Design a protein with these regions (language model features):
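A short, polar/charged loop-to-alpha-helix boundary motif
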Residues: 78-82
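Exposed beta-strand-loop-beta-strand "reactive/processing" segments of non-cytosolic proteins
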Residues: 26-59
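Short, non-transmembrane alpha-helical segments in secretory-pathway proteins
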Residues: 1-28
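A short, surface-exposed beta-strand/turn
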Residues: 49-75
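Detector for Asparagine
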Residues: 2, 31-33, 68
Length: 82
C-alpha cells in the first residue's frame, strides 16, 4: 500500500473518531508495525484567522490503515504553523 492509499483509507475513520474534518495531513510515514500519520484539526475558530487554535494529532495505523492508537501531540495557533 502506498501513502495515498493509506490516506484514503484512514481519513474516514479519523473523521469519525474526532467528529471533525482534518485541516491537513502533515506527514505519513511507514514503519515496521504499519504507519504513523500526523494531522492538524481546527479546535477553536478565532478572528483573525491567524489566532485559530489547532490540535496536532498522531495516529498509529496498522498495515491496512486501521487506527491502533492516537494522541494529541500539541496545540498551536494557525499563525504559528509553517
Amino acid at each position: 500500500m502506498n501513502v495515498l492509499e493509506i490516506q484514503r483509507k484512514a481519513l474516514p475513520e479519523i473523521k469519525e473518531m474526532l467528529r471533525k474534518e482534518p485541516e491537513s495531513i502533515s506527514s505519513i510515514e511507514k514503519n515496521e508495525n504499519g504507519w504513523t500519520l500526523h494531522c492538524e484539526v481546527l479546535e477553536k475558530k478565532a478572528i483573525p484567522e491567524t489566532y485559530d487554535l489547532l490540535k496536532v494529532y498522531e495516529f498509529i495505523l496498522d498495515h491496512d490503515a486501521k487506527i491502533n492508537s492516537f494522541k494529541v501531540l500539541r496545540k498551536i495557533r494557525r499563525g504559528d504553523v509553517g
